């Protein structure tokens, strides 16, 4: 238990020391290891349990297991010491240091810091850009950073020229062209008229052809009937003679 006095690093092993400790507790994010010779426990984060990806620390270690660890970090936060340990840089069978020059540890620490800096900058910039000044009512800065004088002109963030060009292009592309629609309608109407004229001409020609055919048939029938009458008359004359 904490007696109320700030913790000290006097009884802790030196940085990059390798020792064997007992697993005191397993969580979703890592395992806490008892440090020999002191009451403090160190955390082995799941990213430092193995060189392979670890999703469940309980699949790697269990409470009471003895593991080899390397002390890779000590820091004081709110009068409490946080000790970081690593299992993957130590051979779990022999306790041999697999990263004697601490190259792996330094690379991961550098990567972690750059990631934290990037996310912090991104969040800060977005917060500032989306903030509306209470003093002038413009976006992009806080009231404490506002230089506007009472009755003076207001200044706000101006969008980039490229963004304006892209927006204008998209607007032009989306807007219908009034000059194109009438011409298209006229073309369609002309096509419809041509189609109708063709149909009417075809129907007229077919009607005329049918009429001429009927007339030809009628004349041929009349000529045949006249020939038959002539033959009958000739036959009657011969019979009288």
From Swiss-Prot:
Residues 182-198, 226-241 have a biased composition (Basic residues). The modification Phosphoserine is found at residues 114, 183. Pfam families: S1 (PF00575). It is found in: Nucleus, Nucleolus. The keyword Zinc applies. A zinc finger (CCHC-type) spans 131-148. One of its GO terms (molecular function) is RNA binding. SMART domains: S1 (SM00316). The modification N6-acetyllysine is found at residue 144. Keywords: Acetylation, Metal-binding, Nucleus, Phosphoprotein, Ribonucleoprotein, Zinc, Zinc-finger. GO terms for cellular component: cytosolic large ribosomal subunit; nucleolus. Residues 166-178, 211-225 have a biased composition (Basic and acidic residues). Residues 16-88 form the S1 motif domain. SUPFAM superfamilies: Nucleic acid-binding proteins (SSF50249). GO terms for biological process: RNA stabilization. Residues 161-241 are annotated as: Disordered. Interacts with PNN. Associates with the 60S ribosomal subunit. This is Zinc finger CCHC domain-containing protein 17. It comes from Homo sapiens. The lineage of its organism: Eukaryota, Metazoa, Chordata, Craniata, Vertebrata. The gene is ZCCHC17.
């Amino acid at each position: 238990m904490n007696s109320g006095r700030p913790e000290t690093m006097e009884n802790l092993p030196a940085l990059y020391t390798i020792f064997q400790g007992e697993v005191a507790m397993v969580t979703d994010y890592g395992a806490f290891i008892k440090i020999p010779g002191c009451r403090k426990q160190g955390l082995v984060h799941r990213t430092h349990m193995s060189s392979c990806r670890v999703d469940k620390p309980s699949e790697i270690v269990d409470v009471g297991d003895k593991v080899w660890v390397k002390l890779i970090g000590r820091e004081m936060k709110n009068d409490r010491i946080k000790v970081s340990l690593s299992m993957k840089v130590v051979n779990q069978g022999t306790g041999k240091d697999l990263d004697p020059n601490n190259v792996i540890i330094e690379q991961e620490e550098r990567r972690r810091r750059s990631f934290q800096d990037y996310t912090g900058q991104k969040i800060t910039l977005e917060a500032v850009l989306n903030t509306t000044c209470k003093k002038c009512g413009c976006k992009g800065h806080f009231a404490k950073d506002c230089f506007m004088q009472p009755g003076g002109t207001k200044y706000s963030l101006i969008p980039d020229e490229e963004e304006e060009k892209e927006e204008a292009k998209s607007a032009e592309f989306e807007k219908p062209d009034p000059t194109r629609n009438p011409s298209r309608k006229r073309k369609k109407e002309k096509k419809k008229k041509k189609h109708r004229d063709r149909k009417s001409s075809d129907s007229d020609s077919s009607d005329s052809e049918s009429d001429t055919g009927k007339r030809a048939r009628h004349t041929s029938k009349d000529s045949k009937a006249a020939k038959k009458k002539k033959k009958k008359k000739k036959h009657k004359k011969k019979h009288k003679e």
